Design a protein with these regions (language model features):
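A solvent-exposed interaction/effector surface
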Residues: 1-117
Length: 117
């Protein structure tokens, strides 16, 4: 199965989320170099993300992140607007699962990029 090969290639591949025009979409991301090196099957829906100027931050996601992934883009988009920037592409992020020792649970954080102009 194609998805199993992408999952097996972690951490070179990453669970990601992008804020598409139709709403948030969970996906996997990989650099072109790693995709070639790992010979990952690319017969999926592929979106190439060009290198552009972006706002970059890490956001702590709420407990309902799996059901409401768009939440992680709200504050970075508002911050960009408040500084006079406009969105210039598809915001996206990679999901980081962090163990929080004080509460002994895994918490999702998302490293977010918001293309700006």
């Amino acid at each position: 199965d194609v998805a199993e090969k992408w999952i097996a290639a972690m951490p070179a591949t990453r669970l990601s989320v992008l804020l598409d025009e139709g709403g948030p979409v969970f996906c996997y991301s990989v650099s072109p170099q790693n995709a070639e090196w790992l010979k990952l099957p690319l017969d999926l829906q592929i979106r190439h993300m060009d290198a552009v100027s972006s706002l970059h931050t890490i956001v702590a996601a709420n407990s309902d992140f799996a059901e409401n992934p768009a939440q992680v883009f709200a504050a970075p988009l508002e911050y960009a607007r408040s500084r006079g920037f406009e969105a210039a592409g598809t915001p996206w992020g990679t999901v980081l699962l962090v163990e929080v020792a004080s509460v002994a649970q895994i918490k999702p954080y998302v490293e977010v990029w918001v293309p700006i102009k």
